[in-house]
């Protein structure tokens, strides 16, 4: 299964974003940012790829200035691609 990693440069924003997803019933997990992404504060939010459109709209609507990008984490758990 592929996942989307949502990276921020702020741990506070990472946690707040995960809380916003939870409020909307979207399952997410706070994870270590994959080193292949080369961005962020070290923590990111991971969601199933099917929730990517919702996460994208939510990031835009909340205007987190520390947002660093979206990345696809492929099922092998090692391949990361910028979206």
Model-derived features: where do they sit?
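Amphipathic, hydrophobic secondary-structure cores in small proteins
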Residues: 2-5, 9-11, 18, 22, ...
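Absolute protein N-terminus
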Residues: 1-2, 83
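Residue-level marker of intrinsically disordered, low-complexity segments enriched
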Residues: 13, 24, 28-29, 70-71, ...
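C-terminal structural segments of small proteins and small subunits
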Residues: 49-83
């Amino acid at each position: 299964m592929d996942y989307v990693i949502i990276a921020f440069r702020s741990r506070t924003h990472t946690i707040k974003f995960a809380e916003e997803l939870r409020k909307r019933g979207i399952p997410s997990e706070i994870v270590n940012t994959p080193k292949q992404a080369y961005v962020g504060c070290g923590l990111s939010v991971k969601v199933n790829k099917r929730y990517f459109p919702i996460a994208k709209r939510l990031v835009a609507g909340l205007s987190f200035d520390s947002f660093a990008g979206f990345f696809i984490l492929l099922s092998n758990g090692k391949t990361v691609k910028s979206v």
